[in-house]
């Protein structure tokens, strides 16, 4: 008997007379509790929930603008007492879309509504599955997060996950494979009160983080690990413990002696031709794209792919010439929920521009005073939306400040929020560790001294400001990149110049005991950018080397033509090892993106020693061959690449550090 069940028994014995006392009962039934069925009536007719069919399998898709429609009080299943089980399993069968980097979506949350406190949550990102729960002791309460690295969800296929929790042990099994076990420092609480709490399915009570995939099974099994009940399975990706009645049939295949029926046959309407509008009137109707051989369902206001041929990148064409205020050192593409898609340009001269995607193109939206801006970084803290600019030059008073701006929902503009003293700042990186928010700045130089400290800043929830947290010695720092591997957090810096040579070590740091500690060093040549990316369960780091120079030797033209390097994480050796050298021309940026099932890297080649008119190259992942060049893109002084998606397709945008013109390119697929 678990500690929690014993506690419930003691409380019942203490709270009632011994004579005639009613028998002990657990807080919930010990049978599988179908949480998904709690928000779906038998006929499936719930506002905000739509039944779809993918790969011949039924699932539910949430399109609610008000997440409360897919919620229910915890008291509905916690019938005997108000404590969440100490040992349990959560079983999920789902199909998830590709997510942008650093985006998270919630599968499940349990909230104490009066305090709006997250008691328990399950969310995923492009690389991790996170289990969150509230921990408390005499010192107070805090959020604990247990993260499982790369469950391999981003392949547009069905998967079944089993999360088992017991006595400080957390285990994740994907498609009945080998479990990943984590022994955490903090155990799941034995007395997590759910009094007055509410379950939210597919959200955290907000539209931000709303689950955009398809879900078929969401079950809580109190008291035991569900893995032996589900595995092994003949169809591990659809292993089933309990699903809502409306999803029972795998509609792609009839049972023996049964006529195959189509649940939507009476109402189904299929539109042919070019993309029709998707409005309330077309809800639950289909559109067949004969050219692309794809079948789409109108869900909410978007056409959702139900069946599609594999998407392949055919070629790249120019979509827009974006005239900028001046030369552009960096571009940041981001979206604001309910407002739209934006691109912030870091312009060399006194004003930088923010553009909004309107009618298929970027148009000027807001101008902000900057001082030789190098880059922008978009990030969020709760409901707050921020943009931080890295200023390379001083202001009119000779002071060096980089600035954080905050989005005003009332003014629909970014307004000044906080100034931070920096030294020829090149880059900001925003990240979260253990529920705390951080910013790190790449300080390039102070006067002629390139060997200075860059600074990590921590968000203070009380003052609502960023405060200096840790200094890290850098040499001409140009870029920071944050990433996680399993429960570990990493930060890598691109060091460019130490005052005499560009042949310097760039360093990778790991978060340990509340600070970043040196983990690994790489010999780099004027490193200007790091890009981390995942292909399946493999993790890569690509460095952009820009220049091989030493004051002791005469610089030659070919010192700009050198190899940039891709490293791969060797899990066994616990280190990154060289995977591939790629010839580049003063490379300043890497950008990773995917089209369908294919993966690509595009490099910003800026200078070959003679001219800034050089080709930037798109490389395609070809497995054993590594990355192979597939497209040559004419660019002029190329500085930065960003990939982004809209309902109309996929795009790349690059900035030029040598002319006031950036270009938007459309990825044509077939």
Curated annotation (Swiss-Prot):
GO terms for cellular component: cell surface; ciliary membrane; extracellular region; stereocilium. GO terms for biological process: hair cycle process; Notch signaling pathway; regulation of Notch signaling pathway; sensory perception of sound; tooth mineralization. Residues 1-20 form the signal peptide. Residues 59-278 form the Laminin G-like domain. Transmembrane segments: none annotated. In the organ of Corti, expression at postnatal day 1 (P1) is restricted to the basal region of the stereocilia of inner and outer hair cells (at protein level). Expressed in the organ of Corti at P1 and P7, in cochlear ganglion, stria vascularis and vestibular ends at P7, and in inferior colliculus, remaining brainstem, cerebellum, brain hemispheres and retina at P1, P7 and in the adult. Also detected in adult liver, lung, kidney, intestine and testis but not in heart or skeletal muscle. Its main location: secreted. Plays a critical role in tooth and hair follicle morphogenesis through regulation of the Notch signaling pathway. May play a role in development or function of the auditory system. This is Thrombospondin-type laminin G domain and EAR repeat-containing protein. The gene is Tspear.
